[in-house]
């Protein structure tokens, strides 16, 4: 069965309601790479899915209290073993970048696709994550006029620090599937 427009067939769908329509006529030309782990430093649970679908119980972990009432999402999450989850269709605007600026343009959510990597900024990302990210980039470039890639820290400096020092930009951009994207930082 083919995927619906804006959905990747190979991704596990976990639909979020934390999205809205992009402004008319805006080209989707930027990928934003993030990292996330909930609770911090722990991998493999379902807390990220629960956060992006407004089902995270703030009592489940002391660190979750700060997330109470937060309404956020990303288009994709890539787990440590390379599993791909999709929360929002790429044609829609996920709520991943917050207050942000890229090459003089404000509100990066309007023209970007947000990709979360399961990670915490303290550990290296995995080979399956890099491979899955490269394949995802290849698929997204077939649908959208993507030209740029940046980290959340690039578009929200001082406010955000992901994907962090352990993300190897050279390694990603050397993969053939990720070729053609520019990182102006």
What are these regions (language model features)?
Residues 1-9, 24, 106-111, 120-185:
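Basic/polar, cationic surfaces and motifs that engage anionic cell-wall
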Residues 1-106:
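N-terminal catalytic cores of peptidoglycan-degrading enzymes
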């Amino acid at each position: 069965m083919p995927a619906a427009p804006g959905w990747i067939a190979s991704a596990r769908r976990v639909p979020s309601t934390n999205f809205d329509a992009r402004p008319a006529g805006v080209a989707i030309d930027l990928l934003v790479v993030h990292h996330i782990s909930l609770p911090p430093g722990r991998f493999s649970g379902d807390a990220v899915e629960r956060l992006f679908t407004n089902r995270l119980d703030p009592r489940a972990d002391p660190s979750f209290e700060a997330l109470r009432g937060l309404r956020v999402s990303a288009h994709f999450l890539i787990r440590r073993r390379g599993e791909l989850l999709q929360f929002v269709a790429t044609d829609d605007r996920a709520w991943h970048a917050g207050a942000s600026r890229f090459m003089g343009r404000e509100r990066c959510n309007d023209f970007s696709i947000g990709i979360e990597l399961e990670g915490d900024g303290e550990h290296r990302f995995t080979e399956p994550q890099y491979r899955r990210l490269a394949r995802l980039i290849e698929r997204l470039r077939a649908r959208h006029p993507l030209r740029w890639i940046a980290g959340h820290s690039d578009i929200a400096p001082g406010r955000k620090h992901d994907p962090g020092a352990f993300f190897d930009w050279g390694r990603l951009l050397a993969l053939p599937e990720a070729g053609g994207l520019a990182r102006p930082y």
